């Protein structure tokens, strides 16, 4: 498992693939598979049978995971895609934007 620099709640932009240019909030990060679920990106149709949970059944749209390498964090200051660095401030590790050098 590698150290991921994208966390749940971050605003990211898709930089490669079918959904290139789309932006959204990270809902979930799967560290073992190096994938993230981004709100409103990579929507798939899931066919569900009627059950106690959903008596109607039918087709449900939901987000599918996307590779972490295909997303880039958006810098809150410049609103552009940026790389993320990690540095030690005091006795804590903090993430910072490589473009604006601002702590995230």
Swiss-Prot record:
Keywords: Ribonucleoprotein, Ribosomal protein, RNA-binding, rRNA-binding. The keyword RNA-binding applies. It comes from the Bacteria. One of its GO terms (cellular component) is ribosome. PROSITE patterns: RIBOSOMAL_L24 (PS01108). GO terms for biological process: translation. InterPro entries: KOW, Rib_uL2_dom2, Ribosomal_uL24, Ribosomal_uL24_CS, Ribosomal_uL24_KOW, Translation_prot_SH3-like_sf. The keyword Nuclease does not apply. GO terms for molecular function: rRNA binding; structural constituent of ribosome. Part of the 50S ribosomal subunit. Belongs to the universal ribosomal protein uL24 family. One of two assembly initiator proteins, it binds directly to the 5'-end of the 23S rRNA, where it nucleates assembly of the 50S subunit. One of the proteins that surrounds the polypeptide exit tunnel on the outside of the subunit. This is Large ribosomal subunit protein uL24.
């Amino acid at each position: 498992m590698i150290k991921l620099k994208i966390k749940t709640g971050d605003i990211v932009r898709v930089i490669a693939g079918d959904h290139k240019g789309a932006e959204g909030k990270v809902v979930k990060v799967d560290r073992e598979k190096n994938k993230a679920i981004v709100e409103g990106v990579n929507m798939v149709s899931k066919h569900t049978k009627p059950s106690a949970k959903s008596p109607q059944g039918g087709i449900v749209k939901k987000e599918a995971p996307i590779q972490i390498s295909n997303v880039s964090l958006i810098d809150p200051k410049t609103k552009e895609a940026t790389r993320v660095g990690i540095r030690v401030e005091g006795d804590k590790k903090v993430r910072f934007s490589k473009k604006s050098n601002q702590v995230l």
